Amino acid sequence: MPLTEIIAGAALGLALQILHEAIQRAKDRSLTTSCILDRLDSTILRITPLMAKVEKLNKESDESLRKVFEDLKHLLEKAVVLVEAYAELKRRNLLGKYRYKRRIKELEGSLKWMVDVDVKVNQWADIKDLMAKMSEMNTKLEKIMGQPIDCIISEDNTNMDIVERVDPSLEAKAGCSNSDSKPKIDIHLRWSKQSKDHGIRFVLN
C-alpha cells in the first residue's frame, strides 16, 4: 500500500511522509553517501503502518497519551531539518557530513525498535505500554536533536578557510557500516587577520 494512502488524514503520518520525502531529496543530492539515508527511510516506511494504526486509537485516549504523539510529531519535523541540512553540506565538508551522519544514525536507531512492535487494536494495555516506550524514545530523540553540530565564529577582518581530508573508504564505513568505528580526519585551519596569515592543523580519530 502506498505511504500516502496509509497516512491519509493522520497528523503523525503526515510528518512521517514529509520526512520520507526529505530523505529522497537528500539522497538525490548526496548519491555517494546515501546508505545511512536508505536505512532511515526503510525504518520510516516500516513503522508508518503501526503509527497510523495507533494514531486512530489515540483520538480516544487521554491527554497525556495525545501529548506523546504531539511531541513525536514535532521531533520528526526537526528530523526533516536535520536531513535537509545534511544534504546542503558541501562535498568537501567531510567533518560536517560525518557529524550529521552520526546524528542520523542515532535517529534511525531510536526509531527502529518500533519495527517489530505488534499492537492489537482491542488491547488497550498494549497501547498504553507502547505509549510509555514512545515517551522514552521522545526523550532520546530530543537529546539527539538538541546537540549542537556546527559552531561558527565570525570576527571583523577575519577570514577562515577549513580544509578537511579523510580516507573515502573510511567515510563510507562511517555511513554504511553497523560498527562504531570512526574515520581519521586530518583538519587544516587557515585564516588571515590584519594582513597576517595563521594556520593550525589537528587530527581527529
UniProtKB/Swiss-Prot annotation:
Subcellular location: Membrane
UniProt xrefs under InterPro entries: Powdery_mildew-R_dom
BP GO terms, sorted: plant-type hypersensitive response; response to fungus
Pfam families per record: RPW8 (PF05659)
Lineage: Eukaryota, Viridiplantae, Streptophyta, Embryophyta, Tracheophyta
Gene assigned in the entry: HR2
Function (record text): Probable disease resistance (R) protein.
Membrane topology classification: Single-pass membrane protein
Protein name per the record: RPW8-like protein 2
GO cellular component: membrane
Keywords for this protein: Coiled coil, Hypersensitive response, Membrane, Plant defense, Transmembrane, Transmembrane helix
Induction remark: Expressed in leaves after powdery mildew infection (e.g. Erysiphe cichoracearum UCSC1).
Coiled coil, from the record: 70-92, 125-147
Keyword Transmembrane appears in the UniProt entry: yes
Chain ranges of the RPW8 domain: 1-153
Family the entry assigns: Belongs to the plant RPW8 protein family.
Main location as per UniProt: membrane
Top-rank taxon, per record: Eukaryota
Ranges that cross the membrane: 7-23
